[in-house]
C-alpha cells in the first residue's frame, strides 16, 4: 500500500501501459528531461550566459520564462532564436530511451522539446514521422506516416516560432497554434499517455488538463502515467523537496495522472526495455526449411506446421516468416485458415518476407538475403526453429544464419529438437548456453515427447510461447 495517493507500483505501471499497447491507445509525452543524456544542458544552464549579459544571475531567478522575455526585450528576438538554434541543432544522436520509445507501437507523440531526437529515432527504426508544429499542418492529410509528432513549443528549424518567452506563452492559443490545445485535449481523452522527462510546470499543458478536469470532473478523466525521479536522502533540502514531491503527486492525481518513482534515471530505460521486450514477444519469427520432414511423413509434417501457425494466430500472436521451402507455404495456410474462419485480416497476424531466387541488375543476393533476414528478425521477440534441411544440406545454412541473427537481436530461441536438421543443431547449442530458468522451462515444454502426436506437439509449443510471455516482470 502506498502512502502517497496517486503513486503506482512498477508492476501496475507496466500492466496498464501494456493494456494501452494492446488496444492501440498508447501515446507518449516527452519533456526536456529525456534530452539531457543527448547533451541538453537544462533550461537554467541554457539561460545562464544570457542572464549575465543583461546583468542578472540565473541562480536568483525562479521564473525562467520571464528571464527569457527580459533577454528578448534587451537583445531582440533574434538573440533568442540564435540561442535555440545553437543549443538544439547540436542534439543529433537519440538516447537509448528515444530508441526504445520508437520501437513501441506509439502513433502519437507530443513534446515540448525543440530537438529532433524522437523524429530521428523513429526514422532509424524504419518509421516515418509526420511532424506538426503549426495549425496549418493539423488539417486532414494523405501523408504516408507511422507516427505523428506534435511539437507543442515549436522546432529548432523555425526558432522564430518557438515558445520560450512570456510573450510567446501569452500568444499561444490565440495568435499562434490556436488549435493545438484542442487537439491535445482530444488525445488526452482518447489515449493513455506515458509522460517522460516532463516537469508538469508548462502553462499551456496545465491549462489543457485543468480544463478537462473541470469539464469531465475528476471521476471521468482518463488515466495517464508518468515516471519521476524520487527525491534522494542526499539532496539539499531533502525534507522540503520530499514534501513538495508528495504534494505534486497527489495533485497530478486530480487530473488522472499516476506517478511511478524511480531512484535513478537508468530505471526508466529498464522499464522501457521491459515494455519493448514484452511487446516484441507477441511477434514470433518462424525459421525453417524442409526438403524432408525428419520422423514425420510429408503430409504429417505439413499439417504440423499448418496447425502450429493456426494456433499461434488463435492465441493473438503475429508471425513473421521468410517463406522457406517446405515451411513457408504451410505457415501461410495455417494463418489464412484462422483468418478466414474468424473473419480477420491476414496482415494482422502474418508478415511474409520471401527471399529473391534470382539476381537481376547486378543485385548481390547474399547481401540482399542478409538485409532481408535482419528486417525479419529485428521486430520479433521469439524465434521458433522447425526442421532446417535442404536437398543438398542436412543442416540448412540459412536457418543457422537466422539463429545467429536471432541471438544478436536478443530473441528467445525455441528450437524444436525432434524436427531434426538445423533445429536439432540449434537445440544442442542453445541448451548448452542458456541459464535463464524461464527460457529453459519454455524449451523443455516445447520439446516434450509426444510420440508423433502433432496436436500435442502444437499444444506444447504454444504453451512454451505463453511461458515466455509470463505475467511476472
Swiss-Prot record:
EC primary class: hydrolase
Keywords attached to this entry: Antiviral defense, Hydrolase, NAD, Nucleotide-binding
Region of interest: SLOG (STALD) domain: 283-473
InterPro entries per UniProt: DHS-like_NAD/FAD-binding_dom, Ssirtuin_cat_dom, ThsA_STALD
Transmembrane segment boundaries: none
Record's subunit section: Homotetramer; with a core of two SIR2 dimers flanked by SLOG dimers at both sides. 3'cADPR binding is likely to induce changes in the orientation and position of the SLOG domains.
Family, similarity comment: Belongs to the soluble Thoeris ThsA family.
Function: NAD(+) hydrolyzing component (NADase) of the Thoeris antiviral defense system, composed of ThsA and ThsB (maybe SEQ_0762). Has a low NADase activity that is strongly activated by 3' cyclic ADP-D-ribose (3'cADPR) and weakly activated by 2'cADPR. Upon activation binds and hydrolyzes NAD(+), leading to cell death and inhibition of phage replication.
Name of the featured protein: NAD(+) hydrolase ThsA
Species for this entry: Streptococcus equi subsp. equi (strain 4047)
Amino acid at each position: 500500500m502506498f502512502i502517497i495517493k496517486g503513486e503506482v507500483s512498477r508492476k501496475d505501471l507496466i500492466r496498464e501501459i501494456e493494456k494501452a499497447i494492446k488496444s492501440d491507445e498508447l501515446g507518449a509525452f516527452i519533456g526536456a528531461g529525456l534530452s539531457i543524456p543527448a547533451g541538453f544542458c537544462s533550461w537554467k544552464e541554457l539561460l545562464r550566459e544570457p542572464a549575465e549579459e543583461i546583468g542578472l544571475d540565473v541562480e536568483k531567478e525562479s521564473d525562467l520564462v520571464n528571464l527569457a522575455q527580459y533577454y528578448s526585450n534587451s537583445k531582440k528576438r533574434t538573440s533568442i532564436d540564435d540561442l535555440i538554434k545553437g543549443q538544439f541543432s547540436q542534439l543529433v544522436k537519440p538516447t537509448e530511451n528515444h530508441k526504445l520509445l520508437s520501437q513501441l507501437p506509439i502513433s502519437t507523440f507530443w513534446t515540448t522539446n525543440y530537438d529532433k531526437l524522437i523524429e530521428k529515432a523513429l526514422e532509424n527504426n524504419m518509421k516515418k514521422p509526420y511532424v506538426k508544429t503549426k495549425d496549418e499542418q493539423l488539417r486532414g492529410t494523405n501523408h504516408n506516416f507511422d507516427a505523428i509528432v506534435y511539437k507543442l513549443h515549436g522546432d529548432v528549424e523555425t526558432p522564430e516560432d518557438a515558445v520560450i518567452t512570456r510573450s510567446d506563452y501569452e500568444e499561444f492559443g490565440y495568435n499562434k497554434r490556436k488549435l493545438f490545445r484542442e487537439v491535445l485535449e482530444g488525445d488526452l481523452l482518447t489515449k493513455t499517455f506515458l509522460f517522460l522527462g516532463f516537469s508538469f510546470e508548462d502553462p499551456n499543458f496545465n491549462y489543457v488538463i485543468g480544463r478537462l478536469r473541470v469539464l469531465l470532473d475528476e471521476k471521468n478523466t482518463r488515466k495517464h502515467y508518468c515516471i519521476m525521479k524520487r527525491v534522494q536522502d542526499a539532496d539539499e533540502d531533502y525534507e522540503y523537496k520530499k514534501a513538495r514531491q508528495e504534494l505534486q503527486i497527489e495533485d497530478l492525481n486530480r487530473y488522472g495522472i499516476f506517478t511511478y518513482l524511480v531512484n535513478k534515471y537508468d530505471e526508466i530505460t529498464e522499464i522501457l526495455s521491459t515494455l519493448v521486450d514484452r511487446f516484441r514477444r507477441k511477434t514470433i519469427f518462424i525459421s525453417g526449411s524442409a526438403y524432408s520432414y525428419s520422423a514425420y511423413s510429408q503430409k504429417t509434417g505439413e499439417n504440423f506446421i499448418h496447425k502450429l501457425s493456426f494456433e499461434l494466430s488463435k492465441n493473438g500472436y503475429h508471425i513473421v516468416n521468410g517463406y522457406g521451402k517446405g515451411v513457408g507455404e504451410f505457415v501461410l495456410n495455417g494463418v489464412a485458415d484462422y483468418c478466414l474462419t474468424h473473419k480477420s485480416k491476414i496482415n494482422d497476424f502474418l508478415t511474409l518476407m520471401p527471399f529473391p531466387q534470382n539476381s537481376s541488375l547486378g543485385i548481390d543476393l547474399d547481401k540482399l538475403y542478409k538485409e532481408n533476414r535482419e528486417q525479419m528478425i529485428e521486430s520479433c521477440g521469439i524465434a521458433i526453429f522447425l526442421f532446417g534441411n535442404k536437398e543438398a544440406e542436412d543442416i540448412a545454412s540459412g536457418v543457422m544464419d537466422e539463429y545467429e541473427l536471432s541471438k544478436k537481436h536478443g530473441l528467445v530461441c525455441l528450437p524444436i529438437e525432434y524436427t531434426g536438421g538445423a533445429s536439432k543443431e540449434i537445440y544442442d547449442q542453445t541448451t548448452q548456453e542458456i541459464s535463464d530458468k524461464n527460457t529453459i522451462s519454455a524449451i523443455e515444454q516445447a520439446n516434450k515427447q509426444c510420440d508423433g502426436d502433432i496436436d500435442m506437439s502444437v499444444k506444447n509449443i504454444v504453451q512454451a510461447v505463453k511461458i515466455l510471455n509470463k505475467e511476472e516482470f
